[in-house]
């Protein structure tokens, strides 16, 4: 059986996908990717897995599109019985490996947890997640301590229209949004 390499936790652990199941008999796995495009997960060759006994690392050997999904081969895993041990695990990278973005562009992970405040200074809550809807992305804002009320809000992620300012250092997003809505 292949051994996972013990490793220190990544500086800033970021989930980029999940190993969902075994694929074939030669130790390949099916993947669910959170990256955009989904094949972007293959840009990261060094993956961290959080196991009950701590952080472990694996190295991507090969990856490809297979039908509507992704499959990958991990170094040191050559048969389906070996990879069963890593199925169901999230795939992490160190956020420091992400490419630099242009000014005004953000990774979703940077926005999650920001306090959402109206331009009038009313705290609506914190960004709990973002959703892709087709027309535009949507910010899910959940109430937090000190927020205006206990309501969850869905606010279109439309910079310049509804999202007026993002300050990562202050952990705040200013929005043009009626707290009663």
UniProtKB/Swiss-Prot annotation:
GO terms for biological process: ribosomal small subunit biogenesis; rRNA processing. Pfam families: PRC, RimM. This is Ribosome maturation factor RimM. Belongs to the RimM family. SUPFAM superfamilies: PRC-barrel domain, Translation proteins. It comes from the Bacteria. An accessory protein needed during the final step in the assembly of 30S ribosomal subunit, possibly for assembly of the head region. Essential for efficient processing of 16S rRNA. May be needed both before and after RbfA during the maturation of 16S rRNA. It has affinity for free ribosomal 30S subunits but not for 70S ribosomes. It is found in: Cytoplasm.
């Amino acid at each position: 059986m292949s051994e996972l390499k013990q490793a220190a936790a990544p500086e800033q652990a970021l989930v980029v996908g999940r190993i969902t199941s075994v694929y074939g008999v030669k130790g390949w796995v099916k993947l669910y990717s959170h990256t955009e495009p989904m094949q972007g997960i293959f840009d990261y060759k060094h993956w961290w897995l959080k196991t009950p006994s701590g952080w472990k690392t694996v190295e991507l050997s090969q990856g490809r599109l297979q039908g509507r999904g992704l499959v990958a081969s991990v170094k040191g895993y050559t048969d389906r019985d070996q990879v069963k041990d890593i199925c169901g695990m999230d795939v992490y990278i160190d956020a420091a490996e992400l490419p630099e973005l242009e000014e005004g562009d953000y990774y979703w992970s940077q926005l999650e947890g920001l306090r959402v405040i109206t331009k009038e200074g009313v705290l609506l809550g914190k960004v709990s997640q973002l959703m892709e809807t087709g027309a535009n992305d949507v910010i899910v804002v959940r109430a937090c301590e000190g927020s205006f009320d206990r309501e969850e809000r869905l606010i279109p992620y439309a910079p310049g229209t509804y999202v007026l300012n993002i300050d990562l250092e202050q952990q705040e997003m200013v929005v043009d949004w009626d707290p009663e809505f």
